[in-house]
Amino acid sequence: MPIGMPKIPFLLDGDEEDEEEDDATWVDLYNVLYRTRSIFLGDAIHFEVANHIAGLMIFLTIQDATQNLYFFINSPGGLAVAGLLIYDTMQYVTPPVYTLGLGVLASMASFLLVGGETSKRLMGPNGRVMIHQPESDYTHKDQSLEVQLDSGEVEDIRKMVIRVYLERTRLPREVLNDHLERNYFMTATEAKYYGIVDDIGIQNLLARLRAESASQDNSLDPDAPDESASQDNSLDPDAPDETRPPKLR
């Protein structure tokens, strides 16, 4: 029996919280998660998926360019050019992009994990990263000129991938070149050591997401209590700094 897309009840603005669930609007789970600016890649990377993710990042940036984006990744990789579309969008949008690796982060998925905002690249403790060089499928039926042209394109992508890894990680060039020659798997600890991620664990970040989601809901509620009085705490040196991001484990 297929699992299907789960749906959850969602109350529109102005609806009473104690309304019956039958009167609520049922929407896809991901549509509600998008309200917390959480984006998910849970499939192989191809152009349809890449266009969806890039478009969502751009829309959320237009909606609010000051709030973080949270990009959850669990993918076996996929098309290099489609992955580069997502990577370029991550660098283009104004909000900082958290990348959160869960499960397997192979090939182009590991490249996207590296592409997150520096100090905001996280990974689950039981995840696995796999890196290798870009490749193209050739057969004996391919024309030699076509193979030669494709080889040049693959080499250009390989140089670009190496440049990004060298700029955004602590991988020495010699080590990186050696690892790219084959499928090289890393644990979360190894990925942190090489600078592919900045920290391990996302528990505190999930708590922050819940808090931000609640604050957004209160901003739409005219009966919500006025929290402006809390700004007086800024005059108290012992008051907790609520604007400071939580320390990530």
UniProtKB/Swiss-Prot annotation:
Coiled coil: none annotated. It is found in: Plastid, Chloroplast stroma. It catalyses: Hydrolysis of proteins to small peptides in the presence of ATP and magnesium. alpha-casein is the usual test substrate. In the absence of ATP, only oligopeptides shorter than five residues are hydrolyzed (such as succinyl-Leu-Tyr-|-NHMec, and Leu-Tyr-Leu-|-Tyr-Trp, in which cleavage of the -Tyr-|-Leu- and -Tyr-|-Trp bonds also occurs). The keyword Chloroplast applies. It holds the Pfam family CLP_protease. Component of the chloroplastic Clp protease core complex. This is ATP-dependent Clp protease proteolytic subunit. The lineage of its organism: Eukaryota, Viridiplantae, Streptophyta, Embryophyta, Tracheophyta. The gene is clpP.
